[in-house]
Amino acid sequence: GKGANLGEMGRLGLPVPPGFTITTDVCDLFYKNKKKLPKKIVQNIESELKNIEKKTKKKFGDLKNPLLVSVRSGARISMPGMMDTILNLGLNDKTVEALKKRTSNGRFAKDSYRRFIQMYSNVVLNVEGHLFEELIDNYKLTKGVLLDTDLDESDWDGLITNFKELVKKEKKINFPQDVKEQLLGAINAVFLSWDSQRAKTYRKLNQIPDHWGTAVNVQAMVFGNMGNDCSTGVAFTRNPSTGDNSFFGEFLINAQGEDVVAGTRTPQYITKKAKQDAGSKDQSMEEAMPKVYKELAKVFLKLEKHYKDMQDIEFTVENNKLWMLQTRSGKRTAKAAIKIAVDMVKEKLISKKEAILRIDPNTLDTLLHPTLDDKVKKEIIASGLPASPGAASGKVVFSADEAERLNGMMQDTILVRLETSPEDIHGMHAAKGILTARGGMTSHAAVVARGMGRPCVSGSSEITIDYETKQFKAGEEIIKEGDVITIDGGSGKVMKGLVPTVQPEISGYFSTIMKWADEFRKLKVR
């Protein structure tokens, strides 16, 4: 999926970093070959890498001008967050110094290296991700700063040493310095992640065959974390929650893509209007990077016209130059699916028949998502972003396993997390709703919740969660595990106790689609 779309974007004349795709057939060979890459494939990878070197005029592992790559998975059907991504591969103790010299930016070089150690250790060496986050959090506490962006080169240097010590302690090995070993390790890990518990769960929930396998995309890195003329973002060509025909997305200045999706920093809006609607003080991309925004808006329209569907797009801006990293059909709510399908017929992008075929009948019951009864008094304790519509009430749980356990006992739960990760999929499926303290409208929690039709409130920074004591604080309120709360994914409000709901009105778009469906049914019957 991802590799084919990258090639397609290149053909449309859009700026795509050079790279290559290892196909799903290789995944099959990998499993047949006792989970090892066949020699022939390794040779192919090396010659493809030479092509990237030619195009970028950089060399892999070079001590003057090192090539860095990203390694990502690409399944036939997008499985958001199910497979693993590694950025900045090709950095080691020596190439990081070369990168610092080339860019005259020591902070950027060290920040990129610590991110690589973090991702590689987590994905390839199986060191728990939160151990690295804790090291960073403790370091920030001692230094008295709030944000990762407040740390300078010497801070990251110290943390790199701590990270390497952590790997040694956990895995009894030194962090790999050989760039070829790094690359093959990363490719192996992507193939292995196809067999991970979370990927299996997602496939089971979405009827995706186990034998399909995943592809791997290797691509030259472009950097969104070099400074303030750099950024990274995720955007949808229309609103995936409501279906409105307006760009919907988020970006972060001086960041890498993972920061937006993982929800570690709560991002800024892409359009000025969205920023104003949300009452946000931070500059939108349209204001902060007007020239790049204009170019991006053109790309959105071009991609939507080409694929004739709402696209979910990842991009990076390096020194004010736009690069497209991926495009795919975006996950959307049932309500959005109907509105987008009807609108696209009106815009002459698709036919009525195509519009009907695009509606997944299994999701139509979510149109009947209950909404909160306006007449009832509500005790609002916090608010966040309205990430996935609908109202839900249930007992507060802090882990995916607990949500699944209570669901088995026919009890409704609301899963409350700092941010969700792909490991939480089973619990998100079991819970009635999801509440996260961090992350935006394009974070993992938001995208997966919309696809599942689960109400979700994300980025509720007013709540502080304590996993140890199993409680969260919202202002003066303390909510313990097992207490009942209600969330409204349409407004972003979090309420104490059980709030009664009412059945919603069916929209005009729904009746339009049903009318068209009837026309086709009659044609067939006659």
Predicted regions and their residues:
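Acidic, glycine-rich flexible loop/linker segments
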Residues: 371, 379, 387-403, 407-412, ...
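Nucleotide/phosphate-binding sheet-loop regions of phosphoryl- and nucleotidyl-transfer enzymes
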Residues: 1-379, 404-407, 411-414, 421-426, ...
